[in-house]
Swiss-Prot record:
Required for the first step of histidine biosynthesis. May allow the feedback regulation of ATP phosphoribosyltransferase activity by histidine. Heteromultimer composed of HisG and HisZ subunits. This is ATP phosphoribosyltransferase regulatory subunit. It comes from the Bacteria. The keyword Transmembrane does not apply. The keyword tRNA processing does not apply. It is found in: Cytoplasm. The gene is hisZ. Keywords: Amino-acid biosynthesis, Cytoplasm, Histidine biosynthesis. Pathway: Amino-acid biosynthesis; L-histidine biosynthesis; L-histidine from 5-phospho-alpha-D-ribose 1-diphosphate: step 1/9. One of its GO terms (cellular component) is cytoplasm. Belongs to the class-II aminoacyl-tRNA synthetase family. HisZ subfamily. It comes from Ralstonia nicotianae (strain ATCC BAA-1114 / GMI1000) (Ralstonia solanacearum).
Length: 386
């Protein structure tokens, strides 16, 4: 096997793609800052107990594990940054009020989450801690849609769900944990035969309501059907009210309600949202409320947030990241060096052609050039090549 090959679903990021990813990363982090979010940089690896705290079985399967040569304990390479940020909020910052945090960094997965999907996503996201009200969820939803807009993605569809609906139904009669897992999978895939089989032993009202959930999918009018057809439980009413409020604050995004899309049920504790764009089968961003994550660190706090994979978003973003640059000849002239240094100090990209090498027209858009006039070096428009 050639020694330059990389593991399956792992790839280098080449200059053109890296420029685009970095442009989007800067745009989004700058956007988060305008909302008051503070940047944190958690480590790439942690003790496995910390990485997997309060996250459920799925993240355990995704996490690379190895033995720490210093302590002998098992450590993991992070597969999700969200639990790390929850640890920072709960244990390190230890603030009493609202905390807004954001992050951007690579994560590693033992298996790809789908076809042609990298095992090294570049995860970027934002979290609010300390406010249990729907206002925090509304802000996160708004920020997620603004981040996708900053990436140039139009015609975004927002899918909304609320784990409180199923939680209220399951509270009516106990369901074994292993059956719950199968139940969630059947709901997510809308597998009606499997769902009927799994709920066969439940009380009739509970069984019928759970089997109804996959059909409660579509526009905002689904909420009215859900109110009419689901049991009149206070928790269900509150969940539907929350979804109606989120839908009303979706801006220009189309809204779908899907009361069976319960991926991450064990992790989330309230509203869940996912953003889709035309031509892409999977969600480009996901978020929701997860109030229980901080419990493992001794300090449960209300929490809500979203994240996305920058590499995936960059692959579908129309943003052009080919930077404008100034071309300069190679010369030992001190005045030229002074002119170049002055331009670079203002943020301009100035590239000198090395002797015998033409400028790289592919990687940069040379729209200007440094030319000598009367003993001075001045910036002039660059004439297009014939």
């Amino acid at each position: 096997m050639p020694n330059w090959l990389l593991p399956e679903s792992i790839a280098d990021v080449l200059p053109s793609e890296a420029r685009k990813i970095e442009e989007l990363r800067r745009r989004m982090l700058d956007l988060f800052r305008t909302y008051g979010y503070e940047l944190v940089m958690p480590p790439m690896l942690e003790y496995i107990e910390s990485l997997l705290s309060g996250t459920g079985h799925d993240l355990d399967l995704k996490t690379f594990k190895l033995v720490d040569q210093l302590s002998g304990r098992t450590i993991g390479l992070r597969a999700d940054i969200t639990p790390q940020v929850a640890r920072i909020d709960a244990h390190l910052l230890n603030r009493a009020g609202v905390t807004r945090l954001c992050y951007a960094g690579s994560v590693l997965h033992t298996r790809p989450s789908g076809f042609h999907v990298t095992r090294e996503p570049l995860q970027i996201g934002a979290e609010i801690y300390g406010h249990a009200g729907l206002e925090a969820d509304l802000e996160i939803q708004d920020l997620m849609l603004a981040a996708l807009s900053a990436a140039g993605l139009a015609d975004v569809r927002l899918d909304l769900c609320h784990v409180g609906v199923l939680a209220a139904l399951l509270a009516q009669a106990p369901v074994a944990p292993d059956v719950q897992d199968e139940l969630f999978a059947a709901l997510a895939s809308k597998d009606a035969p499997a769902l009927h089989a799994l709920t066969a032993g439940l009380p009739a009202a509970q069984r019928d309501a759970i089997n109804l959930l996959p059909s409660l999918y579509g526009g905002v009018d689904v909420l009215a059907r859900a109110r009419a057809q689901l049991p009149q439980l206070p928790a269900i009413g509150r969940a539907l009210d929350d979804l109606a409020t989120l839908a009303a604050h979706a801006g220009g995004a189309a809204v779908n309600i899907d009361l069976a899309d319960l991926r991450g049920y064990h992790y989330h504790s309230g509203v869940m949202f996912a953003a889709y764009v035309a031509g892409v089968p999977n969600a480009v961003a996901r978020g929701g409320r997860y109030d229980k994550v901080g419990e493992a660190f001794g300090r449960a706090r209300p929490a809500t947030g979203f994240s996305l994979d920058l590499r995936e978003v960059a692959g579908i973003s129309p943003v052009q990241a080919r930077a404008a640059a100034i071309h300069a000849p190679w010369s030992g002239d001190a005045k030229l060096r002074e002119a170049i240094a002055g331009l670079r100090a203002t943020g301009e990209i100035v590239i000198q052609s090395l002797p015998g090498h033409p400028e790289d027209l592919e990687e940069f858009a040379y729209d200007r050039q440094l030319a000598e006039e009367g003993g001075r070096w001045v910036v002039k428009p660059r004439k297009a090549s014939a």
